[in-house]
Amino acid sequence: VKAVHQAYLASGCNAIKTNTFGANRLTMGEETCRKVIEAGWNIAREAAGDAFVFADLGPVPMTDAKRALEEYRFSVDLFLELGATNFLFETLSSFSCIGEIARYIREKQPEAYIIISFASQPDGFTRSGQLASHLIHQAEANPAVDAVGLNCVSGARHMISLVEQLGTVEKPLSVMPNAGYPTVLGGRTIYEGDPQYFAGQMERLHAMGVGILGGCCGTTPKHLAATVEALGGSAPKEIPVVQPEQKKPQPERNRFWETLEQPGKKPIAVELDPPESGD
């Protein structure tokens, strides 16, 4: 994990987040959750050097808002004890209890920097059926929140459309797209988004006023290095038109088809019927 942090920092990133997205007592129990948060913070802190470290908290599997708030408080208290001052609540589908936990952090650590980020489909709606733009403005109106944004689910190109739908956002805006969309190849889920294309879209987002840029699912150090290079420390004067690189699909070997194409060979199909009550 430390090596992964260092790879992203070497690509030019000036902030990393702890490897604690799914850490909560509902999914792993209190003892394991505590160990994961402590290890996640310490590893990120060791790797960061002068870079910022954000305590990363994903959505809590909600039974109800009260229980979710208790889970967030448990994690937040641990991070605060460890010395965290930057917090990222990401991949959210609603604002339920998030405003309250943001105020809780602010009371405990007045110097905290808190980012609230929602996950939206390309059509503008979150998994809970709420408009991401409404959630963004709801979060922005909370005095305890420092920055708002979007992450995950959508690729960089669709993030541009989502940002266009937001209207005026007074607080700093964060966008962390996926590296395109996932495909399953050979039983593995992969993202084939080209780093240069990704960087071009990120450049457009920066020109639109997005002040905090990063990557979510499928983004590698190459994607972020290309983004850092494309930005060059300032927003472009014109929004560039970037065309994605056309990739040729790689043929997959099919032994059944190969047998059909060979003269004199016949495929043999066998049906296996398991015995009754067999396991």
PLM feature segments, named:
Residues V1-D279:
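Domain-level signal for soluble alpha/beta catalytic cores
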